[in-house]
Amino acid sequence: RGSVRPWSRCFWSSWVGDLFTDLIGQPLAVNLLTAALQQQRLAPAYLFAGPEGVGRRLAALRLLEGVLAGGVLSSRQRRRLLERNHPDLLWLEPTYQHQGRLFTSSEAEEAGLSRRTPPQLRLEQIRNVSRFLARQPVEAERGMVVIEAAEAMPEAAANALLKTLEEPGHGLLILLSAAPERLLSTIRSRCQLIRFLRLGDADVQQVLQRCGEQKDDPLELLAMAAGSPGALLEHRRQREALPVDLVDRLETLPQEPMQALALARDLCESLDGQQQLWLIDWWQQKLWRCGAGHDPMHRLEALRRHLLGFVQPRLAWEVALLDLSVS
């Protein structure tokens, strides 16, 4: 299963050459992955390293298609990959833990769960990787595992993954990471590194056009996206989710203490922890473009550290906004 017969090698080479055509702005990654498939010399583990939203997830899907196809991939197989319900595919994301259950970011948002801290890849998730790869594949030649945000592993989970990488068997692991420097060096050394770069403006617009998502974006959102079409779409979503009255009040710094305290109260009542962290980034860009100077930027950066350090959010916002109202 999955091997290429000599008589079909020419067709296979041509098909693989077209496999990554929708991966825009990543020629180096495309060349490396295409060559690996054409020569049938896949590494046991890959590290797709680069910013969020520049095509790492799409590249992983296309590579999996190439692994499954053997020259031909049915629409049913492609749909199962996209829906992540192929029996030989395990796709992991960082999760939140609530009442003994694990929730991905999208599931936590749908369930209305409080998200004060970033999600993590849990030890039990990583242990499942080893069990998954140890079993006999159902349809494919090998078990396939994709781990998103691999840098979100605490030490115990990272050590468990390292043991799997030391004896990967016939499986294929793809780690996606926007911060590969946070991974154990021993994990990085056991993966073939594929770098993904930020896109130029023309490539960003080409991606958005293909997705039917072109529009005039505020300069602060474009700056936050920094060459990442996926990040731009996520920043749009976050911006559109903000209550309109809060956006209006954040156009300028608070002028009076009572105004600052009321804003802190309303922010904490309206936004969860992850939304508050996003808001700091957005407000910094907004104020910088309005010529607010360095002091508000430094104060908002300190606020971010306090929120990440488990300071009570409303208290952290009150102190920060009071400082900003008199600065």
Regions from the PLM with identified roles:
Residues 17-156:
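Clamp-loader machinery-focused feature within the broader ASCE/P-loop NTPase space
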Residues 17-82, 170-172, 177-327:
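Charged, glycine-rich active-site and insertion segments that engage polyanionic ligands
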Residues 134, 159-170, 174:
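Conserved catalytic/switch belt of AAA+ P-loop NTPases
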Residues 149-153, 168, 180:
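Conserved Walker B
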